[in-house]
């Protein structure tokens, strides 16, 4: 049986991805380059269960980390493809050089805002190549990478509004100028947002109430 289906369209190549879990054991990753007329697939082995909250994304190669090879060689896919998921107390993220056919590099993001119930793997990419993850933690935070997933940094925000107990998933989005917007549920059950205009390096510390 399958569950947690998720779709993604690469904003640069127009490749359409379809992923879903096979229980909590492994993940099926499929893609099409002809608008669904035919599909290729990768029955990706996510390692020992439990694997949950799967997400796939893609974005430009950078000139650092995993991007050194990805952006320089014509043998690699035009964009970096990321597959992330939750493994109970931490998030796992992997990078593909071949458009999602395999995920050879990456691992568990241990020690970066992933303890305390970091139940999320919802990766988001920006046009400048920065990739973001919103962990489900007590203090609103963002994990981000500027080298296509080799290294990650953490930034916090929202200490003026906090989070509820039990916590809820947050979400992050980016715009065409690579500004980033993190949205989460505050301690009063309101929806709040913080913005970064410098590719994730700093975030508004006065939270904006959305609703």
Name the predicted role of every residue range.
Residues 1-211:
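Mobile, glycine-rich extracellular loop/lid and propeptide segments
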């Amino acid at each position: 049986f399958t569950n947690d289906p998720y779709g993604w369209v690469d904003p640069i190549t127009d490749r359409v991805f379809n992923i879903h879990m096979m229980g909590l054991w492994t993940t099926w990753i499929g893609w099409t380059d002809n608008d669904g007329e035919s599909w290729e697939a990768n029955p990706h082995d996510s390692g020992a269960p439990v694997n949950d909250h799967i997400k796939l994304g893609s974005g430009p190669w950078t000139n650092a980390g995993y991007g050194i090879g990805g952006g320089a060689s014509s043998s690699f896919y035009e964009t970096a493809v990321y597959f992330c998921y939750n493994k109970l107390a931490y998030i796992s993220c992997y990078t593909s050089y071949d458009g999602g056919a395999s995920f050879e590099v990456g691992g568990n993001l241990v020690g970066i805002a992933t303890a305390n119930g970091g139940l999320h793997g919802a990766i988001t990419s920006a046009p400048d190549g920065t990739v973001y993850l919103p962990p489900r933690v007590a203090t609103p935070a963002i994990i981000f990478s500027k080298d296509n997933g080799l290294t990650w940094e953490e930034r916090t925000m929202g200490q003026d509004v906090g989070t509820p107990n039990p916590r809820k998933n947050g979400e992050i989005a980016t715009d065409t100028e690579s500004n980033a917007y993190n949205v989460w549920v505050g301690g009063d059950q309101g929806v709040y947002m913080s913005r970064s205009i410098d590719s994730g390096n700093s975030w508004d510390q006065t939270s904006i109430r959305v609703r």
